[in-house]
Amino acid sequence: DFSDEIINSLSRNGVVNGEMIAEAAMKFDKNHENPLLMPYYENGSRSDNPYVNFYWDYCAQGKAAYAEVNFISLQEAINIIEESGGIPILAHPGNNIKENINLLEQIISCGIKGIEVYSSYHSKEQVEFYKKFSLKHKLLLTCGSDFHGKTKPSIVIGGTDCEGIEDKIISQLKCYC
């Protein structure tokens, strides 16, 4: 049970996502007893990042509440980032691409300029893999926690170690611009 009013108050420009639906549903006290939502409340098995976990459990591709989204191509995204003065960086590849070298090479052939080597999602082995891959392909190395505020409360800003090379990363990013 939840209201359109709550969902609309959480959305920007009428755009609604699965995390917002989870937050709206969890605001109602009577939903605390709903067996579908119980894992997302405090001390539940999915409570570490409840809104994002709800999204992956119910709204992701192949799940009951999935709605198809038409995304722009990678090339279009890279062009928009560069036209806006940004640097196209591949974020936390260990979370979705893993160590698929063929896919990584396809992605960099589109014009990606760097890889988020240091990520809250990466194991030490993945950090080493992406560091070697990035250096081999002369890509920028970056670091990110993937902090998203209330949607990922278990992740904190600055909570990702980048082996003491913060200044080098920042310097290289500044030189690129």
Locations of regions flagged by a protein language model:
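Charged catalytic cores and adjacent phosphate/nucleic-acid-binding surfaces used
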Residues: 76-86, 90, 94-177
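Extended substrate/RNA-proximal surfaces in nucleic-acid metabolism proteins
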Residues: 1-97, 101
